[in-house]
Amino acid sequence: YGTWTQFSNLRRIIMTTETKKPGRIADYNKTLPILELYTCIQSEGSRQGRPTVAVRTTGCTHRCWFGEGGWCDSWYTSIHPGKGTYTFNDIVKIYDENPTITEMMLTGGSPTMQPDLCNELTHFANQRGIFITIETEGSHFIETDYPFGLISLSPKFSNSVPKIDVTTPMGKLVDQKMIDKHNSLRLNHQAIEQTLAYHSDYHYKPVYDGTEETMNEIEEFRVRHNIPKNKTWLMPAGDNREELIKQYPISLEKAFEMGYNWTGRDHIVAWDTKRAV
């Protein structure tokens, strides 16, 4: 019964919106919009603690600022996006050099802005027996040829909207244009419905800043999309060790109160603002 219901819901959702199938990457030596490529331990969410290869794309639809929690911890892919430096062959090579790793964390930025890369990675993962987790805010639905193993969904609530005249990490002042860009696809509910229905599994990983306003938005979103509490992982805001640790007890208590799971951000606790860890 559950399988048939899932199929019916998927068919209904996909039929309501035309979706363009992503392409493939023919040239494995071409430089792609990948800013970082490294081995690490997954430090957030339901697959925490597993050795993985992180593939970080550059470019993002959002400009997240969490007040005292700081800017997005990967601001160098979004607010001030760097240029990609890696090829698909570099991904092949890192798995060849680390044959015991069978996980991939596709992150950003916003990796769903790169549909052909996402699709090619699902082919590679299917051939190699690799489990892909894609971290996404849900702005774009991609009907990849093979579903992702896990959608790690972190939608952007009102606590992520930057404020006028706040200074970005590289000294730019926030203006209305930046705010409008951030809000344009901040909660694309239709794309989120399609994504959760199509791909293999998901967890919901909202960023919590300690306010009741944010918690209300987190819970409203969970109810709207029929997300079970056991698939919800509350994560504290913070782009550095000091701010993050301040939020740990607040978010732990709230997760317990709400009946959610809780996740830390171990890479920030261990290495603070160091990149590629």
Where are these regions (language model features)?
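Short, Lys/Arg-enriched N-terminal segments with co-localized hydrophobic residues
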Residues: 1-14
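General helical secondary-structure elements
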Residues: 7-8, 52, 124, 261
